[in-house]
């Protein structure tokens, strides 16, 4: 795979990273991919419009941020097919109100980035393709708060990403950053660390490409 990276952002009900992330991507000439819940579309219509105006991909992260499978038992389901489809269609209805047509947003990141083959098959049947971030860099730990066992500081995440790059490269990586995080986390990755990381990776010869180009859809 080529020396290219795609930045993904997900959010359920927080948008505190909006200004920092939008301006960083604009400054660096990068088109990101953003996945929001129905609640997010209803709470932050102005943020959604700003992202669309900048030419970013804006898609679904479900309507109600449902947990599809129990933690630790990915093969079983907590939702019926009907519940799954109803929730997802509802999210596309909310998106349509924001001016996002179904054909503009065929790629979907499930809630909690947690799903199984059955969910992917149900989505595919609706003409929707599930995507997920590339695991291993710990970029997605940027939501953790200091009281958590799995807490990682922004510097620790930054260092981990670069150590993975040094060891095996980040070719074709879909890197997940959270669009907003808990107020208890004052050390926000999107403030400073994200831009530093982008600059370092560009210097190493990486190109940041839009999601649809990366997955070819």
Can you say where each PLM-predicted feature lies in the sequence?
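Active-site beta->alpha N-cap acidic-glycine motif
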Residues: 1-76, 90-106, 197-200, 216
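Catalytic domains of cell-wall/extracellular-matrix polysaccharide-remodeling enzymes
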Residues: 42-43, 67-176, 180-202, 206-207, ...
């Amino acid at each position: 795979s080529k020396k290219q990276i795609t930045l993904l952002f997900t959010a359920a009900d927080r948008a505190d990273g909006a200004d920092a992330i939008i301006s960083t991507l604009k400054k660096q000439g990068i088109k990101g991919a953003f996945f929001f819940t129905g609640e997010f579309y209803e709470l932050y219509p102005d943020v959604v419009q700003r992202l669309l105006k900048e030419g970013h991909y804006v898609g679904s992260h479900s309507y109600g941020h449902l947990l599809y499978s129990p933690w630790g038992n990915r093969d079983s389901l907590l939702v019926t097919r009907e519940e799954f489809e109803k929730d997802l269609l509802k999210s596309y209805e909310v998106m349509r109100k924001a001016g996002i047509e179904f054909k503009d947003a065929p790629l979907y990141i499930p809630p909690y980035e947690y799903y199984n083959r059955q969910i992917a098959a149900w989505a595919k049947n609706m003409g929707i393709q599930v995507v997920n971030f590339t695991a291993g860099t710990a970029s997605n730990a940027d939501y953790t708060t200091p009281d958590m066992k799995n807490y990682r500081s922004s510097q620790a995440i930054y260092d981990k990403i670069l150590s993975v790059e040094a060891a095996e490269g980040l070719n074709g990586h879909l890197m997940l950053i959270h669009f907003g995080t808990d107020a208890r986390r004052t050390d926000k990755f999107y403030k400073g660390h994200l831009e530093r990381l982008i600059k370092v990776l560009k210097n190493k010869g990486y190109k940041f490409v839009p999601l649809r180009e990366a997955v070819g859809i």
